[in-house]
Amino acid sequence: MAESTETGGTAVNEPAGSQPIDDSEMPLAEHIEEMIKRLGIVLVAMGVVSGVVFPFADDIINFLWYSFLPGSPTVCPATADQASAACPYVYDPLSLVLARLKAASLAGFVVALPLFVYQTYRFMRPGLYPTERRYYLAAVPMSLVLALVGVGFAFFLILPVIFQYFLGYSKPVAEIAFALEDTFGLMTLLLGFFALVFQIPLFVMLAIMMGITTRAWLASKRLYFWGGFAGVAFLFSPDPTGMAPVIVAATMIGLFEGTLLLLRWTGRG
């Protein structure tokens, strides 16, 4: 005899005796305390990784900067003979420190993503069925893999296109003086954002495997998701020309639709 638990309009069938072992009522205050504890662990881990990486922040800045912009540390600041070098300029005393913090925080953020998934699992574990626990645990290493793939996607495909567009868009009008904080902030924002964006397939598959929703329901609401993705992309991609938000939104929609297509092809959900 199987027990069926309704979750989000779908049924999750579990054999008798496989119900959540640790499921018990907890006061709201204890739930909030547990949630804060789990988030605290994630933030502390992010801070520790950022602190370890901080001494190497200048190397990270130089590596990222000259991966997408012309020039090198040996020719900056630019002279008349190297006027084509896109050297970083500091316009206030805190700009360099803030850029270093952003470089270190990017590393901490990428490492913290799978830890966040794991701590979410620990928070929800008492109410999960054994099969749901297995799905969630399998998602932890996959989260790190997807985060690294997202960073790589942004590094090799998105950022080069965006900065080539910026350079070509501005050259006929003015000589660009690249502000370190703003320009490097855009780099780290997009790298970190794509690490997060590439979690979309994981979240979709987890939600379906755990019976929270179905592929058919997600497909029927796709236009709402597309609109949400576009809104988030334009909110977190500070580019008044619209180039970066369009690329980010297209990537999010592509990941969402690709996941639904894969689930349909495999017959899951």
What do these predicted ranges mean?
Residues M1-G269:
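Membrane topogenic/interface segments and analogous intrinsically disordered interaction regions
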